[in-house]
């Protein structure tokens, strides 16, 4: 375990609430808290047992005045989150008492923790690996039950075990190659080369299984970025309101009412989906509306999915065709809206035939008709079959990239062996593949990148 100074931070959101928790970790944490704690009947923390709590007060050292009534819990390292001696002070959930207690801890010898420093210490002290540490922030940011369960599995080390299993197999192959080079025999090298190719193909298959679910995993982690587009007044804002079941966007008969981008998250069978309502795309001389149209186009570029809305009560025009041309390279669903007006758009229309989407849905957003079909289409576009929370899913783009690079190195090793080049050259590619997988767990990752990952965490975590 590494040696560090003692750090402190507020672990709960700032503001009014039932309680606030101030976390302190390091070898001097018990001494520091003891110096400002006064228990009932002048009891101290000298005899506090690990994994227990003690009632008392935090006292300002200089004035000897009481700051707040508290409960102090003590977790002795290495059996704590950071693998260090850790204390948590539970005080009343107000801004003033929380700040005053933290200030007193700093005055008594603790240092204000950096964002993510508690989790970083858990990683550096060997209690968790980097993929497990990243899962902590995924749990905090999860937007659906399914995304939380996926993050919890990663936090438990499910991904780490699979990665370590593959890396151990790679090390055995490298050792086999080195033994062959050290004790060369004409027929031994050929046999070893053939065996290594078989092993590498099995490893690639395992990596492929992880990569295949990574796009779905990325959506579970980051959400499905879904943008609603169409001309003004086709029902985009009404669709947003219907999907989130709230009157978030202003709906009027006046075209061009929505001039800015409105974003909300919804849960579609466990899939966190960000719904983005955009300004209607059309030619306009209105300066503000024109800015809104440009923002709409930017959001389309960023989208995972586009919902293209057409008005069943009106004929297709040049503006519809221009929008279609703009989204043709995206995944999209077409909504033929305003079915309730009974003015059915001619589905034999050449434009409708040209729509490159198997998902064309007639809807009446006003009457909530077709919304369930829309949600089912969204799920089917990105997920094959039922999404199961017990399956191992790669959710992090960094992990996906490392897997892809590792796979490429394995393929390069097979090509080297196939070209009958000296077998020890293949070990270079296999070692690179091993290194790339180690970036997922943090075993072979540059310290600056590790620092950047933890800097994205919140204070107190």
From Swiss-Prot:
Sections of the chain in a coiled coil: none
Please state every residue range assigned to the domain named TrmE-type G. Answer: 223-383
Report if keyword Nucleotide-binding is assigned: yes
Q: Which UniProt keywords apply?
A: Cytoplasm, GTP-binding, Hydrolase, Magnesium, Metal-binding, Nucleotide-binding, Potassium, tRNA processing
Q: Where does Mg(2+) bind?
A: 237, 258
Which organism does this sequence originate in? Clostridium botulinum (strain Langeland / NCTC 10281 / Type F)
Q: Which cofactor does it need?
A: K(+)
Comment on bound cofactor: Binds 1 potassium ion per subunit.
Tell me its family.
Belongs to the TRAFAC class TrmE-Era-EngA-EngB-Septin-like GTPase superfamily. TrmE GTPase family.
* UniProt xrefs under InterPro entries: G_TrmE (IPR031168), GTP-bd (IPR006073), GTP-bd_TrmE_N (IPR018948), GTPase_MnmE (IPR004520), MnmE_dom2 (IPR027368), MnmE_helical (IPR025867), P-loop_NTPase (IPR027417), Small_GTP-bd (IPR005225)
Record-level Gene Ontology MF annotations:
GTP binding; GTPase activity; metal ion binding
What is this protein for, i.e. what is its function?
A: Exhibits a very high intrinsic GTPase hydrolysis rate. Involved in the addition of a carboxymethylaminomethyl (cmnm) group at the wobble position (U34) of certain tRNAs, forming tRNA-cmnm(5)s(2)U34.
Q: Biological process GO annotation list?
A: tRNA methylation; tRNA wobble uridine modification
Under which main EC class is this enzyme filed? hydrolase
- Which positions does UniProt annotate for K(+) binding? 233, 252, 254, 257
Question: Which residues of this UniProt protein bind (6S)-5-formyl-5,6,7,8-tetrahydrofolate?
Answer: 23, 88, 127, 461
Report what the protein is called: tRNA modification GTPase MnmE
Q: How does it assemble?
A: Homodimer. Heterotetramer of two MnmE and two MnmG subunits.
Q: Does the keyword Cytoplasm apply?
A: yes
NCBIfam families reported for this sequence: mnmE_trmE_thdF (TIGR00450), PRK05291.1-3 (NF003661), small_GTP (TIGR00231)
Q: Which residues bind GTP?
A: 233-238, 252-258, 277-280
Q: Where in the cell is it found?
A: Cytoplasm
Enzyme Commission numbers on file: 3.6.-.-
Q: Which GO terms describe its cellular component?
A: cytosol
Which PROSITE patterns does the UniProt record give? G_TRME
């Amino acid at each position: 375990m590494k040696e560090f100074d003692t750090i402190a931070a507020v672990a709960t959101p700032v503001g009014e609430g039932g309680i606030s928790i101030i976390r302190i970790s390091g070898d001097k944490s018990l001494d520091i808290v003891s110096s400002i704690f006064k228990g009932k009947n002048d009891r101290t923390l000298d005899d506090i047992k690990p994994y227990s709590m003690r009632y008392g007060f935090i006292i300002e050292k200089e004035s000897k005045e009481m700051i707040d009534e508290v409960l102090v819990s003590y977790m002795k390292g290495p059996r704590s989150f950071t693998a260090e001696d850790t204390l948590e002070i539970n005080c009343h959930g107000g801004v003033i008492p929380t700040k005053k207690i933290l200030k007193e801890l700093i005055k008594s010898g603790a240092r204000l923790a950096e964002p993510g420093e508690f989790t970083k210490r858990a990683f550096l002290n060997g209690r968790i690996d980097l993929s497990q540490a990243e899962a902590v922030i995924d749990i905090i940011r999860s937007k659906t039950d399914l995304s939380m369960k996926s993050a919890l599995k990663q936090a438990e080390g499910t991904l780490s075990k699979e990665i370590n299993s593959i890396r151990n197999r790679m090390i055995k192959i490298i050792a086999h190659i080195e033994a062959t080079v050290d004790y060369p025999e004409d027929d031994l090298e050929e046999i070893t080369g053939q065996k290594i190719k078989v092993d590498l193909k099995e490893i690639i298959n395992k990596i492929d299984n992880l990569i295949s679910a990574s796009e779905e995993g990325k959506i579970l982690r980051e959400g499905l970025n879904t943008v609603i587009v169409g001309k003004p007044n086709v029902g985009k804002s009404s669709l947003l309101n219907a999907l989130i079941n709230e009157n978030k966007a202003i709906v009027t008969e006046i075209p061009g009412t929505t001039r800015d981008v409105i974003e909300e998250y919804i849960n579609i069978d466990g899939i966190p989906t960000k719904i983005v309502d955009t300004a209607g795309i059309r030619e306009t001389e209105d300066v503000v509306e024109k800015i809104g149209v440009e923002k709409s186009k930017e959001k389309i570029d960023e989208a995972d999915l586009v919902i293209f809305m057409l008005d069943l009560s009106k004929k297709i025009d040049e503006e519809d065709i221009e929008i279609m041309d703009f989204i043709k390279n995206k995944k999209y669903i077409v909504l033929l809206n305003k079915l309730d007006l009974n003015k059915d758009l001619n589905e034999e229309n050449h434009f409708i035939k040209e729509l490159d989407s198997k998902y064309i849905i007639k809807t009446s957003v006003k009457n909530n008709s077709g919304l369930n079909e829309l949600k089912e289409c969204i799920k089917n576009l990105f997920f094959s079959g039922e999404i199961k929370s017990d399956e191992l899913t790669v959710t992090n783009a960094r992990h996906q990239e490392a897997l892809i690079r590792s796979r490429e190195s394995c393929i390069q090793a097979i090509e080297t062996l196939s070209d009958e080049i000296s077998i020890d050259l293949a070990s270079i590619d296999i070692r690179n593949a091993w290194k790339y997988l180690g970036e997922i767990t943090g075993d072979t990752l540059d310290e600056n990148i590790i620092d950047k990952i933890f800097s994205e965490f919140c204070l107190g975590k």
